[in-house]
């Protein structure tokens, strides 16, 4: 999901969960992966992401563990680059995929 808010927020990415332990773990892992990747690829820039519970239809009505991610404000020219540039889209997809692998491995340990 791409955030369509008109005003620039200082948050880079919003990670929403259902409130269940598994969903919270997944979104916290996502935030940690993104934070680590931002530190590596954009040192000194910092990363601001938030994890919170949201009562969204798509989260409530999904059987597997779910997360909803807002990647930016489409009306902001800097955030647009996350979506418009194919390398950026691929990086985001890779980071999200990495999160699922980490989350799965953590789940198997339990």
Predicted regions located by residue number:
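Active-site-proximal helix/loop segments of hydrolytic enzymes
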Residues: 1-110
């Amino acid at each position: 999901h791409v955030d369509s808010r008109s005003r620039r927020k200082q948050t880079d990415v919003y990670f929403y969960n259902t409130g269940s332990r598994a969903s919270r773990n997944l979104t916290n892992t996502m935030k940690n992966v993104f934070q680590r990747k931002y530190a590596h690829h954009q040192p000194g820039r910092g990363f601001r992401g938030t994890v919170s519970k949201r009562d969204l239809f798509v989260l409530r009505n999904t059987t597997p563990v779910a997360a909803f991610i807002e990647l930016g404000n489409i009306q902001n020219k800097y955030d647009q680059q996350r979506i418009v540039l194919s390398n950026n889209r691929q990086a985001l997809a890779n980071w999200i995929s990495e999160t699922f692998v980490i989350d799965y491995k953590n789940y198997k340990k339990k």
